[in-house]
Amino acid sequence: MAESMVTDPIYLDETAKANGAKLDLLNATMLGVSASLGVLAKAQTGIFEEMDYNAIKAVVDAGSAPITFPTGTQLVNTYTGKDGKAYDCPWDVVQPDDTAEGESGATVPAMVLQMHYATLYDLQFSAYQAFYVVPDGGLVAGTYNVKMGLNWGNNVKTDAVYQFTLTKAAPAGARLTGFYNAPDVVPANWKVYVYKDQQKSELLETCSVTAGSAGTNLGTFLAKENGDLNGLHPVGYGDNRWWKSAYRQYLNSDAAAGAWWQPQDKWDMKPDQADTLPGFLSGFSDDFKSALSRVKVVTYGNGVTDDGSAVVTYDKIFLPSLQEIYCSPQVSGEGSYWPYWKERTGAKTPQALWQTYPLRITRDLAQRTVGRFVRLRSANRGSGYGAFVVYSSGLVGTWGGISALRSAPACKITKLA
């Protein structure tokens, strides 16, 4: 039976403002701090006040967050875009009564906040990954071929062999990329690209690909890494694993454009936006950045390019998982559900994947009537390239790692250093 649709969200902007007005008085009485602990009203000057993060941490550490900051409360700070324009940036209290584990293993009370609106800029979860690392001694000019060891989509067929010709030698450490979107692009349009390094500092050559087995065989493509070749899934559509994602690096950095990305393994390639986007945290105040702690985040692999087991990262900012936003996960263990999403959707049980839920639409920070695709960190367990997203329509599905999308990231407020 189809789940009945809830059309009125639990937390309207008006509700959050009303809750905030009540909390202002309560917080001022209890803590003697600014009314900025609740939902903030815009000042006549157009400046949005910053929150007293030390006071908030004290409330959380005392175990009083569920009373002081009930689920759905909005705490507002300021985000400044790369053009210098400032936006009020509400954070929803999605779980006031949580715990967080730090890198030392210490566990403390925590309150989970999630951005109410989508981030300002599109970013790839992962770039197209390299398929071959040029070994010491380089590759001489000449013809090379690869064999397909899998069926994938309409155009990748087992035992088919394709060749390409280097017109000049490729130096040691260069990366070969290509076969982009291979299952959905006819082989006649495939290319191989030779980059000097993983930073893509120089494109040395672009080669056409044709059917044929002339020259030196470099190996056989499988979905996963095989011999000297990377898996065709991340080569063709990007990698879907949170631990090595460009998105993770972006969200956790305040470095300038061109300075926040580093390769996470030998196949990783720089995303297209890395040279033009500064790190996400660069848009926030020093006070907010100082209030953030690296906390344990658990994310499972995909079961295709790896064994699908859990990987632990320690992140200040992280993308939500399916489980955390009250959707039915493909594997349990990527955090616990956040009551905000249960109450916002009105769902009685975790919502099914591949269905559309209008109350899940996340709108743009700058254009607040415009819905955006927002990334989750959960990998599609059945592929080495697709990660889950919530579409601009509210559909919960997957999208290739190479697609540049927005997000509504989260953080945990704790006393951890």
Model-derived regions: residue spans:
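Collagenous Gly-X-Y triple-helix signature in extracellular proteins
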Residues: G32-Y132, D136, G149-G153, T165, ...
